[in-house]
Each structure stands twice: as structure tokens, then as C-alpha cells.
């Protein structure tokens, strides 16, 4: 599933707004110990973002790459922009940036994902963040996770993933190191006790 499919969806799917939590036996390095926020799920596939993988880039790096600022301008960025988190969202279109954010900011390019969270992938939101006028809560993700028709369902059926309702606090929390364990805790699961062969919720 792609961003264009997300834009054109008419109803929410079964896994929309859910967390996928990788089982310990996940062999794909892209997804080992990941927590993924599912933005769209339908018969055509699914799309979501890894929310617990850091990126070796800063928001200043992104602005410089996009020619939005010059080197000398970086020192006058508002604190919210200097400290803005950049994360790895997944292996698909890994050079493309997406901003997952609270719904206090909406533009023509914003796509509602849930009642409180939207997704924007335009330069307008990047400019707004650089000026300190962006959403109150947000993170930029490079790339996304995508599945074709029936693929995610098959992976869940073979115990590749656990799923549970998403938690907004966890989505935007900037502490990534223990986010996997905290996502499991939402389900009452201790990561140390989780078997690679456990069933799914």
C-alpha cells in the first residue's frame, strides 16, 4: 500500500490505528524489535511507520538538504526545530520524509489517520516546524513500512506480529530505547518472558 492509497481510502480498516509489535523471532533486520503504527489497512494492503528506530540525521540536516536554510541560519532556528526528532519509518521510500503529528496542524496535504493524529508529507509542514509554528506533537519519519494484499494478515497469522490499540503518548515519546518493551507492557506482556512462538492478540 502507498501514500496515494491512504489518501483515497473511504473507510478505516481493521488494523488502522493499531500497533504492530514484532515477535522475538522476527528475522527481517528492518523489523526486528520494532513497534509500527499502522496508518491504513485494507484488502489492498497496509501502510505504517516504525516508531522506535533513530536516524543519524537532525532536522537541521534535513533543512540544509532541502535548501531551506544556509549553514549560518541553523543557529537561529527556534529550539523546537533544533530538537525536532528524525526517525527511520521503514524500508519503503527511505529517502522520503513523512511527518506524523497531532491534529492541531492541518494543511491541504494533511491526511487524517485517526481522530487525533494526521500525516503530512509536504514541504509546508517542514517550513512551519522550522519557524516554530508547526504541530504541538510531531515526529519526522524517513520511509515507511508497506505490505501488499494479504501479506500482513499472513505474517500475523504465522505469529510474526502482535497487535494492540495504539497509544498516542508512545507514538510521540522521544525516548526510543525502551519503546519496544513499553509497547509490550500495554498488552501486559513482559518482553523477557515473551516466546518467539507465542500466539497473537
From Swiss-Prot:
Domain of life: Bacteria
Entries under InterPro entries matching the protein: AlgH-like (IPR003774)
One family name in Pfam for this protein: DUF179
GO cellular component: cytosol
Stored Gene3D superfamilies: VC0467-like
Record SUPFAM superfamilies: VC0467-like (SSF143456)
NCBIfam families according to UniProt: PRK00228.1-4
Family: Belongs to the UPF0301 (AlgH) family.
Name recorded for this polypeptide: UPF0301 protein Arad_1256
Amino acid at each position: 500500500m502507498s501514500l496515494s492509497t491512504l489518501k483515497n481510502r473511504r473507510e478505516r480498516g481493521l488494523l488502522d490505528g493499531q500497533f504492530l509489535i514484532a515477535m522475538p523471532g522476527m528475522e527481517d533486520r528492518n523489523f526486528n524489535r520494532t513497534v509500527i503504527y499502522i496508518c491504513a489497512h485494507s484488502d489492498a494492503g497496509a501502510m505504517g511507520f516504525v516508531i522506535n528506530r533513530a536516524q543519524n540525521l537532525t532536522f537541521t540536516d534535513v533543512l540544509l538538504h532541502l535548501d531551506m536554510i544556509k549553514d549560518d541560519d541553523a543557529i537561529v532556528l527556534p529550539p523546537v526545530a533544533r530538537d525536532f526528532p528524525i526517525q527511520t519509518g521503514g524500508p519503503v521510500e527511505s529517502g522520503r520524509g513523512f511527518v506524523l503529528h497531532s491534529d492541531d496542524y492541518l494543511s491541504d496535504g494533511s491526511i487524517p489517520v485517526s481522530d487525533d493524529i494526521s500525516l503530512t508529507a509536504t514541504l509546508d509542514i517542514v517550513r512551519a516546524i522550522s519557524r516554530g509554528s508547526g504541530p504541538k506533537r510531531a515526529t519526522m519519519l524517513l520511509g515507511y513500512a508497506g505490505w501488499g494484499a494479504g501479506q500482513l494478515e499472513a505474517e500475523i497469522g504465522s505469529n510474526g506480529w502482535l497487535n494492540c490499540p495504539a497509544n498516542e503518548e508512545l507514538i510521540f515519546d522521544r525516548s526510543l530505547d525502551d519503546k519496544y518493551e513499553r509497547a509490550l507492557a500495554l498488552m501486559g506482556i513482559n518482553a523477557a518472558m515473551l516466546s518467539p512462538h507465542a500466539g497473537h492478540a
